[in-house]
C-alpha cells in the first residue's frame, strides 16, 4: 500500500514543490482540501479531494471539511495494535502517514485595524488544530508538519530513511505541532478577553507563549544562560529592528537599548539624544540639530557615556555619526540611518547600529519573575499632562522654567527610584538614581551638577518625605522643583520652598521605577 499524505494549508509557501517530491521520490498518494487541492491540481499533481475521499461534501460554508472518521481514524490508528487495524479494515479506512497542516492566520487577521469580532471569529480554525493534535498524539506512527520551514528537513529525513521517518524526528515534529496549537489557542483566548467589555484590564488567567528569536551568549553575567524570545508572530518592537553592523547583541545590550528607547520616545519634536548606562540615563539633551543634541548629551557626563548606549529620535545623519566615532560606544539606535552616516560608522566595525522605525512601540505588559510566579503590570504610559499640574509655591514659574520642568520630568520618569534629575537648557546636569533614601539621590545629582545647578530645575519621581531635599536643592542654587506631592509633610516642603524663594510644582502623578 503506498503511503498516504494529507495536505491542508493556509500558507501555500512551498507546498506544491514539497508535494511533488512526495509523489515523485517516495510514491505518496495525496489527499487535500480547498485551496490547497486547487493549487496541487493546477500544478498537475494527482490529488484526491477530501470530500471525494470521505464521501461527505464540505458543509456550513467550509466550516466542516476534514472532521470525519475516515480522516481522523486514519490518523489516530495505532499500527502496532491489532484491534485498531481490525477497525480500519472493517470500515475501509486507510492509515494516513503524513499530515501537513498550517492554520488560518488568526493573529495577522486581528492585527488589521478594521477587524470586527465576527470577522475574527471566522478566522478561528477548527479542523486544522484537530488534525495537528491527532497527528501529534499519534507521533509513534504519523509525521506531522505545521510550517513550510519543516518541508526541507522532512524531505531530507525521508531520503535518509528510505522513505520513512525516525521516531525521534516524528516526536520533534509533534512537539512543534503542540506548541503551534497552544500558541494559536492562546492568541484566540487573549483576543476574546480583550474584546470582552466586562473583562478587567488584567485577566484572571494569563498565558504567555513565546518563540525563541535569538540565542544569546549569556545573561547579565557569563555564568547565566539567556535567550531572546518573541511573543506571538509580532514583527514590531526589537525583533523588527534592523542591525546594520556590529557584534551580536547581548542580553545587557537589549536591556539597555530598551531603557534608552523608552526615554527618547518621550521626545517627539526637537532633535533629542539619550545616552544610558545600566538602564539609567547619564545624558539626555535636546538641540536645534541632532548633532547638537548628541554632543550636549555626551558632555552632560562624558565619563559615564564611555561605552554607553545611544538612542536618537531622528534619523542618524553624517555629522552626528562623525561625532559618535570620537568615543567608544556599545550601541546606537535611531528611527533611520542616512547612507553617509552608515558609511562613516563602518570605521567602527564592532559598534552595534540598529534602525528601529517606531520608537514609541513598547511592551504591552511588564512581567517580573518572583519565586513561585510572576508579577504583571501595565507599562507606565501615563501621558505627561502639564495642564493638570499645580503650582503650590508663592513664587510662580516663568515660561522658561515651566518648559524646563517638563523636560526634567520626562527624564525622571525613566530613572531608577529614588530618582532625582537636575536639568538646565534642556540638558541633564545631574542624575541621582537608585538610592535607598531620596536625599541621597538629591546629593548625588547636585554634586554632579556642581556650579551649573545655579538657576537649574530639579525633578523627583516621588514625593519628599521631609523638607531636607528642598533645602539642599536651594543651597545648591536650584530655582524650581517638580515632584508628585502626596506626602504627609507636603506643607513642610512647600513652606521651605516659600522661605527660600523656590518654585514648587506638584504633578499629582508618581513615576516609581524599580
UniProtKB/Swiss-Prot annotation:
Pathway in which the depicted protein is active: Purine metabolism; IMP biosynthesis via de novo pathway; 5-formamido-1-(5-phospho-D-ribosyl)imidazole-4-carboxamide from 5-amino-1-(5-phospho-D-ribosyl)imidazole-4-carboxamide (10-formyl THF route): step 1/1; Purine metabolism; IMP biosynthesis via de novo pathway; IMP from 5-formamido-1-(5-phospho-D-ribosyl)imidazole-4-carboxamide: step 1/1
UniProt KW Transferase keyword: yes
Any GO MF annotation of the entry: IMP cyclohydrolase activity
Pfam families linked: AICARFT_IMPCHas, MGS
UniProt-listed GO biological process terms: 'de novo' IMP biosynthetic process
Catalytic activity from the UniProt record: (6R)-10-formyltetrahydrofolate + 5-amino-1-(5-phospho-beta-D-ribosyl)imidazole-4-carboxamide = 5-formamido-1-(5-phospho-D-ribosyl)imidazole-4-carboxamide + (6S)-5,6,7,8-tetrahydrofolate; IMP + H2O = 5-formamido-1-(5-phospho-D-ribosyl)imidazole-4-carboxamide
EC number per UniProt: 2.1.2.3, 3.5.4.10
Keyword Membrane tagged: no
HAMAP family linked to this entry: PurH
Domain comment as written in the entry: The IMP cyclohydrolase activity resides in the N-terminal region.
Name of the protein in question: Bifunctional purine biosynthesis protein PurH
